[in-house]
């Protein structure tokens, strides 16, 4: 049986978390000097900031060279094929893997270098602040305190908002109000164990098929997958900040069966609810 990979810099790491962040210091011929190759992308988003050297991003025959100050955004399902540029002696890049909050979506619509890979380069006046924010996200994300992940998520939100301040917002149409309302309805009914897409669609005056299409088009994920992410996120919050019994936590996010809740939670996070709670203490 293969051992679990606990280093997010190496292939095989599961990324079963709402936020993981770090620095990848690639030196020529070093142990990290290989190309990341994920043809199907990932379930969440990845932000990538080059701080030293040069990297190269490949996507179906096209290439992009990233240099210090460049920020790339890989959305769910986007091809990941990148590494140190062969003409550079190093490529140091910071990165943040995350599952976004629903209301972030219009902040995640970036101009693309190709396919769906987004690109942003702050001007010289703003660059130091973005570098500082990235470092703060990594420090918080790697912390072991009860609120470390929430702090990292809030810092990431600040980074996304700082970017929105720095660009012409008219280039980015807002999220469809029906999708936004659907997200709010789902969030308000996480405890409903009889949830179905038809009830959400009826609430926003769409057919289930049309809602499913719009949801995936704008959020890059299915209705049910998004709801499961929100349920697990809320369960983690309740487990880490209250002494509520695990069965009650499960019922609060729509799981009447505690054993089934525990199985789903462990599948999504890599830890059982009791293990997760113990790690927060």
From Swiss-Prot:
It is found in: Cytoplasm. Residues 198-219, 246-269 bind DNA. The keyword Chaperone does not apply. Keywords: Activator, Arabinose catabolism, Carbohydrate metabolism, Cytoplasm, DNA-binding, Repressor, Transcription, Transcription regulation. InterPro entries: AraC-bd (IPR003313), Homeodomain-like_sf (IPR009057), HTH-like (IPR037923), HTH_AraC (IPR018060), HTH_AraC-typ_CS (IPR018062), Tscrpt_reg_AraC-type_HTH (IPR020449). Residues 180-279 form the HTH araC/xylS-type domain. The keyword Cytoplasm applies. It comes from the Bacteria. Alpha-L-arabinopyanose binds at residues 8, 24, 38, 82, 93. Its main location: cytoplasm. Transcription factor that regulates the expression of several genes involved in the transport and metabolism of L-arabinose. This is Arabinose operon regulatory protein. It comes from Citrobacter freundii. The lineage of its organism: Bacteria, Pseudomonadati, Pseudomonadota, Gammaproteobacteria, Enterobacterales.
